Amino acid sequence: MFLQTYETYNSINDRDLKEKNVVVIDTLRATSVITTALFNGAKEVIPVSEVEEAIELSKNFDRDTFLLAGERNSQKIEGFDLSNSPLEYVPEKVKGKTIIFTTTNGTRALKKVASAEEVILGCLLNVSAVARYISKSNKDTVIVCAGTEGKFSFDDILTAGAIYEKLKSLTDFESDDLSKASYFLYKPYENNLYDIMKYGYHLRRLEELGYTEDIKFCLTVDKFDIVPKLKNGIVRTSQDF
C-alpha cells in the first residue's frame, strides 16, 4: 500500500485518483461537522460547492426533511439553518435530516475528488476509525487536505500526520515525502496539538471570530468511531452504503 498526501485539493487531478482510495480532511471545520452530524443521527449530508446550488437543491425536499447549512468566510450564511460549527449539530436538530452543506474549503474539496473509486472523510474526531478503514482496504490511498482558501493549512496536515501515526501501528506501507513530513510535524505535538496549530492562519482567524469552543471540539482525538463516506454525491456513514 502507498500513502500519498496533497496539501490542498487544488494540486490534484483525476489521474492522481485513479484506482485509489481518497481521504478528504478539513479539520477546521467541514469534515468535523459532517462527522459530528452523522454520529448525531443525520440521515445524510449532501456537499455542494456554491450557496446558490444549495438553495436550488433544497427545492427538491419537503421543508421539514432538510437543513441548509454551511459558511462563507467562516460565518453563517444568511437564511441558512446552521453554520459550520459542529456544536450546532446536536441530535435534536439533525436526527433524521438531510443536510445540504456548503463551505469555503471542505465541500469544494469533496466535489473535486468525487470521481475517485472511494472517498471517505477524516478529521481528528475519527482519526483511528479512518486509519483502520484504510488498513482494511489495503489499497493505495490519497490524503487530500482541503487547506484554507487554496493554501496549506496546519490543521489539515497535522490530521494527515495523525492518520499516518495510527496507520503505522496497523500495517506496513510506503509513503511520499509529504506524508512523512506530516507525521514528523504531528508527532512532537500529539498530546497538545493546539501548541502548534495556534501558529496557523486558519485557527487564529477562528479565534478572532469567537469560535474557541469549536476549535477545542475539533481538536478532540477519537471522539467518534465512524467513517463518513461519499458516494454518488451523498455522504453517509460507511456502514449505511
From Swiss-Prot:
It is an enzyme of class 3 (hydrolase). SUPFAM superfamilies: ComB-like (SSF142823). Keywords: Hydrolase, Magnesium. One of its GO terms (molecular function) is sulfopyruvate decarboxylase activity. This is Probable 2-phosphosulfolactate phosphatase. The gene is comB. Its EC number is 3.1.3.71. Signal peptide: none annotated. The keyword Nucleus does not apply. Pfam families: 2-ph_phosp (PF04029). Belongs to the ComB family. The keyword Ion transport does not apply. Its cofactor is Mg(2+). It catalyses: (2R)-O-phospho-3-sulfolactate + H2O = (2R)-3-sulfolactate + phosphate.
